[in-house]
Amino acid sequence: MDIQSVLQKGEGISAEFKRAESKVPDNLFETVCAFLNRNGGIILLGVTDSGKVEGIKAGMVEKFCKEISNLSNNPQKLNPTFLLEPAVIDFRRKKLISVYVPVSSQVHRCAGKIFDRSVDGDYEVRSDDQIRNMYSRKSAYYSE
């Protein structure tokens, strides 16, 4: 993966940047859930929304990777679970974490809520029609 091109393109339907200087972002799994439910994507931790590379505090990178892997396997956080494998990237003498999230054949929930991805944001899916449409989209896509 070419980090420079991801940064140049900016956030979009399949790319999300999150600051993570001293902790894993609270809304990380909303994005994971939205990517699983839509087209998949890449999350870069240590980058601002505008694409500025800030990096992650020294000594926190391995802790964050373990936390992300553990939470992705926790049905209270992400259901059904989907084990993520964060990757550490050295970029411009700063540490980033890259989380690749593929599209999933299932509809996922984050803390009991369904999220979808649109343009460059994660949105909670609340209406019965939207939820039905998501299940139909997944069913049609994975049964062909």
Kindly give the residue locations of the regions a language model identified.
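Conserved N-terminal catalytic/coupling substructures associated with nucleotide/phosphate chemistry
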Residues: M1-E144
